[in-house]
C-alpha cells in the first residue's frame, strides 16, 4: 500500500480517464438513435411525398399543366398567324388607300380636263352657231343680190335690145 502522506486518494486508472457525466458510449448511442430517428422521419416524408406525387390530384394537375402548355402553344401559334394576317391586311389596306388616292387624283385631273373640253366644245358650238348665222346672212344677201341681178339683168337685156333696135332703126 502507498504511504499515507499523499494528499489524494488512490483512484483506478480507467475511472480517471472517463469524463464526468455521460460516457462516450452513451454519446454514440444517442447519436445513433438520432440518426435512426432522422432516417425514419426522412423515409416517412419520402413515402408521404411519393404518395402525394402519384395521387390522382397530382396526376390531374400534371395533365392539366400539359394541356395548358399545349393550349398556350396553340394560342401563341394562332396569335402569330393572326398578327401576320393583320400585318398583311394592313399592308393591303395601305396599298388600297394609296390606289384610292391615286385614282382620286386621276379623277380630279379627268374632271378638270372634261370641264375644259366642255368649255371648249361650248365655245366651238357658239362659234359654229355664229358662223352658221353669218353663212345664212351671206346666203340671204346672195339670194337678194342674185334676184336683183336677175331683175336688173333682165332689164339690162331689155334695155340693151331696145338700144339695139333703136340704133338699127336709126341706122336704116
Swiss-Prot record:
Glycan attachment sites: 70, 97
GO terms for MF: identical protein binding; metalloendopeptidase inhibitor activity; protein homodimerization activity
Compartments (UniProt record): Golgi apparatus, trans-Golgi network; Cell membrane; Late endosome; Membrane raft
Cross-link Glycyl lysine isopeptide (Lys-Gly) (interchain with G-Cter in ubiquitin): residue positions: 20
Sections of the chain in a coiled coil: 103-149
Transmembrane segments: 27-47
UniProt keyword terms in alphabetical order: Cell membrane, Coiled coil, Cytoplasm, Disulfide bond, Endosome, Glycoprotein, Golgi apparatus, GPI-anchor, Immunity, Innate immunity, Isopeptide bond, Lipoprotein, Membrane, Signal-anchor, Transmembrane, Transmembrane helix, Ubl conjugation
Residue span(s) of the pro-peptide: 153-172
Membrane topology: Single-pass type II membrane protein; Lipid-anchor; GPI-anchor
Tissue-wise expression: Ubiquitously expressed, with highest levels in brain and liver. Present in liver (at protein level).
PTM text: N-glycosylated. The GPI anchor is essential for its antiviral activity.
InterPro entries linked: BST2 (IPR024886)
PANTHER family given in the database record: BONE MARROW STROMAL ANTIGEN 2
Comment field on protein domains: The extracellular coiled coil domain forms an extended 170 A long semi-flexible rod-like structure important for virion retention at the cell surface and prevention of virus spreading.
Source domain of life: Eukaryota
Subunit comment: Parallel homodimer; disulfide-linked. May form homotetramers under reducing conditions. Isoform 1 and isoform 2 form homodimers and also heterodimers with each other. Dimerization is essential for its antiviral activity. Interacts (via cytoplasmic domain) with ARHGAP44. Interacts with MMP14 (via C-terminal cytoplasmic tail). Interacts with LILRA4/ILT7. Interacts with RNF115.
One GO-annotated biological process of the protein: response to virus
Gene3D superfamilies according to UniProt: 1.20.5.1700
Protein name: Bone marrow stromal antigen 2
Species this chain originates from: Rattus norvegicus (Rat)
Lipid-attached positions, GPI-anchor amidated serine: 152
Gene Ontology cellular component terms for the protein in this record: apical plasma membrane; cell surface; cytoplasm; Golgi apparatus; membrane raft; multivesicular body; plasma membrane; side of membrane
Role description: IFN-induced antiviral host restriction factor which efficiently blocks the release of diverse mammalian enveloped viruses by directly tethering nascent virions to the membranes of infected cells. Acts as a direct physical tether, holding virions to the cell membrane and linking virions to each other. The tethered virions can be internalized by endocytosis and subsequently degraded or they can remain on the cell surface. In either case, their spread as cell-free virions is restricted.
Cytoplasmic side stretches: 1-26
Amino acid at each position: 500500500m502507498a504511504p499515507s502522506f499523499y494528499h489524494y486518494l488512490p483512484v483506478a486508472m480507467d475511472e480517471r480517464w472517463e469524463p464526468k457525466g455521460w460516457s462516450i458510449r452513451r454519446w454514440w448511442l444517442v447519436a445513433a438513435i438520432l440518426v435512426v430517428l432522422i432516417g425514419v422521419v426522412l423515409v416517412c416524408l419520402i413515402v408521404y411525398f411519393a404518395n402525394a406525387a402519384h395521387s390522382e390530384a397530382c396526376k390531374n394537375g400534371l395533365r392539366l399543366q400539359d394541356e395548358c402548355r399545349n393550349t398556350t402553344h396553340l394560342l401563341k401559334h394562332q396569335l402569330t398567324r393572326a398578327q401576320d394576317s393583320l400585318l398583311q391586311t394592313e399592308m393591303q389596306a395601305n396599298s388600297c388607300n394609296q390606289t384610292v388616292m391615286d385614282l382620286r387624283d386621276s379623277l380630279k385631273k379627268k374632271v378638270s380636263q372634261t370641264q375644259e373640253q366642255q368649255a371648249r366644245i361650248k365655245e366651238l358650238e357658239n362659234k359654229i352657231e355664229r358662223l352658221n348665222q353669218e353663212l345664212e346672212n351671206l346666203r340671204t344677201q346672195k339670194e337678194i343680190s342674185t334676184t336683183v341681178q336677175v331683175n336688173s339683168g333682165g332689164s339690162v337685156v331689155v334695155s340693151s335690145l331696145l338700144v339695139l333696135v333703136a340704133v338699127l332703126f336709126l341706122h336704116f
